[in-house]
């Protein structure tokens, strides 16, 4: 259907198929969508991006650690030996996340070793290593054999109304997720917006953005 609508040769056939009044209704709908998008468009935040800054203190616990920096704090929380959750807050108030899907007490705390290692801190389980740079709060994750998994560049930053996370993209990592997208399933090499849009009247492969943008990213790596 998309090819039919976008082919100028099919325009006369398409117009003959339309019932009286449909063209006017379609134009009015498009005008209404444009007007509402303009009216309710959110103002873009301004100002510099903030980071945690240099790490000033670390509070280790049975799940990992809370690292307090110059301008914010990081929480490194190991859900299991191979799954870790990272949170960042400017006010350093980390309240327990609520979930309807997890029964209280269902998780078993993994063994986590915390130590100061030269220019950073090191948290390690039986499966993962998390390294935190003291001068910046940047995170690096490795497997226990030293194989890198993820490296911040520069990492978690924020300003009013926005949060940004940047990391180095390892060679060969396949990129999936981010909601409804067109084109190849592996998104590597593309620049995509996390913004919902209703393209009219149709869209070809590669159109961005579409109806559902979800800030969930899945990176798949293969290690021999």
Language-model segments: which ranges?
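N-terminal accessory segment at the very beginning of proteins
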Residues: 1-224
């Amino acid at each position: 259907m998309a090819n039919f609508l976008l082919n100028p040769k099919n325009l006369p056939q398409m117009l003959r198929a339309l019932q009286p009044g449909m063209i006017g209704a379609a134009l009015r709908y498009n005008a209404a969508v444009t007007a509402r998008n303009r009216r309710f468009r959110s103002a873009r935040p301004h100002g510099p991006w903030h980071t945690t800054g240099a790490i000033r203190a670390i509070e280790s616990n049975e799940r990992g650690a809370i690292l307090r920096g110059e301008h914010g704090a990081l929480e490194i929380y190991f859900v299991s030996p191979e799954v870790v959750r990272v949170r960042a807050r400017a006010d350093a108030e980390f309240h327990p996340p609520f979930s309807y899907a997890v029964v209280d007490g269902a998780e078993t705390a993994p063994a986590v070793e915390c130590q100061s290692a030269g220019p950073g801190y090191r948290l390690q389980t039986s499966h993962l290593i998390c390294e935190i740079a003291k001068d910046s709060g940047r995170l690096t994750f490795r497997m226990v054999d030293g194989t890198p998994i993820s490296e911040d560049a520069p990492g978690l930053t924020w300003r009013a109304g926005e949060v940004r996370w940047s990391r180095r993209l390892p060679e060969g990592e396949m990129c999936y997720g981010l909601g409804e997208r067109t084109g190849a399933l592996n998104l590597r090499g593309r620049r995509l917006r996390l913004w919902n849009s209703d393209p009219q009247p149709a869209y070809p492969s590669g159109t961005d953005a579409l109806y559902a943008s979800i800030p969930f990213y899945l990176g798949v790596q293969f290690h021999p």
